[in-house]
């Protein structure tokens, strides 16, 4: 948190791409309404990049979904999130209600870039279950991945929070992991030596109001 020449406080907020797409645009207006003297500067990147920016004091606070490894950063899990398997209408899985992990063998996927928490979680899952898949799309934009699912017939694994519109209009069918292996948290992260201003505490309070995730009634199951 820094003081500008105009005597207004600036909070440098970092968000991962998933968080920056589905949550940060809502958080910032709420925070500025509660703290009108605070100007929020937003930076969106993947988990690894946000971690490094926090360590270099280029950001005051971050909200991430991936794993943070530095012992110099304090991590506070707050918001529930779930990855789901996204399937478009042209894919044979679209009409199914239940899939098994073996069904994913050699399927074509649209994936996030290396350094993404979403990608890491799914790759760890694939390794545990000894399945191989083909990455035919790679992008750091959730919109690009969604369009690949919609129009190119590939699969993708991404946050449920990114697809509510497509799920409601039945253009995408999703499968949730039955064992909860894709459940995760959005986490508030800051340097352990960071002085926490009232704006950071208010950001934490606002985050708690988003902690629950809505599961669609027609979601399929991946076993």
Q: Which residues make up each language-model segment?
A:
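Hydrophobic hinge/microswitch elements
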Residues: 46-51, 55-59, 64-65, 121-174
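Secondary-structure junction motif
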Residues: 93-94, 107-129, 160, 196-205, ...
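Flexible hinge/capping segments at coil-to-helix
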Residues: 4-5, 70-109
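Residues embedded in well-ordered beta-strands
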Residues: 84-86, 92, 155, 173, ...
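A late-sequence structural motif
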Residues: 22-23, 173-216
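Central regulatory/effector-binding core of bacterial HTH transcription factors
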Residues: 8-71, 139
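Short, well-ordered beta-strand segments
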Residues: 10-14, 62, 86, 110, ...
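Short beta-strand->loop
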Residues: 74-84, 160, 169-183
